């Protein structure tokens, strides 16, 4: 098994990232067989596709690395690195841009969402973004790519690109990766203010998300203010249909406590959200507070974070190099 995944170093790590991706990365790392390999990276080249504040980006890279380590990524067992430090990502991305088709990228919903009404003003990088993401995983012959549901379409594109390249050049160079989306309730954590929007770093309202950096009081306040409805908790999952905010809070509680929607409803049905919310707050504080404390400690040692990232990049480069060499050979660029 070769597990590869990334996160953009923009803004704070939030509960959606944790449940949809990071805590699953940690579990895969912790349950790994000795021959499995895990590569996790800060997708800083992806962060260039929208407006860049260089000082902010520099700070965010360290902060996100510290947040991943605080969440349980162990640099001795996983390869943790900065995408831009391994040049092969950008190099392979170019090659794969010549394999991917305009029509495939035109179907990517994230570009439509992120460019909004201003398609003409969006960067070319924002459009080509999913091809760089394909390069990120194909470079390492990833077998499993653990991501939240919102990234599924991008991983499916990576599969299409791998298949077309292999087919066009009569090679088996690229392993076709599997998107590895969490089962249960964590694959798509929604905003606390709007059950139809996903929890996201880019939501202007901080009340919409729980951050790794939130104090216990901030978590309690956000849950207190989270949108719900006046109905009591149902006894069956079907009773959550048409109640996206209620469903989201039950889903979060299930994911955080290791339960299922059914088990949460079995314990809490008939209650109003006024009494469910304190239980949810306690569960979230129990999850977040220890990670936040570790993050604060790690922040104090920027040099150590830099050392970890540099060592990770050295290891990643060794794994990346043969893919580029072989890609250039089958393309006719080298003998
Ligand atoms: P990013 O930085 O937006 O998010 C990092 C991870 O968190 C997951 N996630 C969520 N999961 C559940 N509910 C949510 N509300 C939620 N919000 C975010 C994302 O699905 C993701 O797994 N393009 C990627 C980064 C990337 C990448 C890659 C991922 C670059 N190259 C190669 C995998 C493989 C992104 O912007 O994720």
Question: Residues of each region from the PLM?
Answer:
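Short, solvent-exposed beta-strand edge segments and adjacent coil->beta transition regions
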Residues: 10, 142, 205-207
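Conserved nucleotide- and phosphate/pyrophosphate-binding catalytic cores
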Residues: 15, 153, 159-335
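Short helix-capping/linker segments at secondary-structure and domain boundaries
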Residues: 102-106, 139-146, 254-264, 292
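Internal, conserved structured core segments that host functional sites
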Residues: 116-165, 169, 191
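An acidic site on a long C-lobe helix of protein kinase domains
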Residues: 60, 88, 153-154, 245
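N-terminal Rossmann-like or analogous alpha/beta NTP/dinucleotide-binding catalytic cores
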Residues: 2-135, 283, 296
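A generic secondary-structure signal for well-formed alpha-helical elements
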Residues: 65, 72, 100-103, 142, ...
């Amino acid at each position: 098994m070769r597990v590869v995944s990334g996160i953009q170093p923009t803004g704070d790590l939030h509960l959606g990232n944790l449940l949809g991706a990071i805590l699953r990365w940690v579990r895969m790392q912790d349950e790994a067989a000795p021959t499995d390999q895990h590569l996790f990276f800060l997708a800083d080249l992806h962060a260039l596709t929208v407006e860049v504040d260089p000082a902010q980006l520099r700070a965010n890279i360290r902060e996100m690395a510290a947040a991943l380590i605080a969440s349980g990524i162990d640099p001795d067992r996983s390869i943790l690195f900065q995408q831009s430090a391994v040049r092969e990502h950008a190099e392979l991305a170019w090659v794969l841009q010549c394999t991917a088709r305009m029509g495939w990228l035109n179907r990517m919903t994230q570009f439509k969402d992120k460019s909004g009404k201003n398609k003409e003003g969006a960067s070319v990088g924002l459009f080509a973004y999913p091809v760089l993401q394909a390069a990120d995983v194909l470079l390492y012959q990833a077998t499993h790519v653990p991501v939240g549901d919102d990234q599924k379409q991008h991983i499916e594109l990576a599969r299409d690109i791998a298949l077309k390249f292999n087919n066009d050049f009569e090679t088996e160079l690229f392993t076709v990766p599997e998107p590895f989306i969490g089962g249960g309730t964590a694959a798509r954590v929604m905003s606390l203010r709007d059950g139809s929007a996903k929890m996201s770093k880019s939501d202007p309202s901080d009340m919409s998300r729980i951050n790794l950096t939130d104090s216990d009081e901030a978590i309690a306040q956000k849950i207190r203010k989270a949108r719900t409805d006046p109905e009591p908790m149902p006894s069956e999952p079907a009773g959550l249909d048409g109640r996206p905010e209620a469903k989201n809070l039950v889903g979060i509680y299930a994911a955080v406590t290791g339960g299922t929607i059914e088990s949460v409803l079995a314990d809490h049905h008939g209650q109003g959200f006024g009494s469910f919310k304190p239980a949810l707050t306690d569960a979230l504080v129990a999850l977040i507070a220890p990670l936040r404390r570790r993050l604060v400690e790690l922040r104090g040692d920027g040099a150590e974070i830099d050392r970890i990232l540099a060592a990770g990049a050295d290891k990643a480069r060794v794994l990346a190099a043969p893919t580029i060499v072989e890609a250039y050979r089958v393309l006719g660029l080298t003998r």
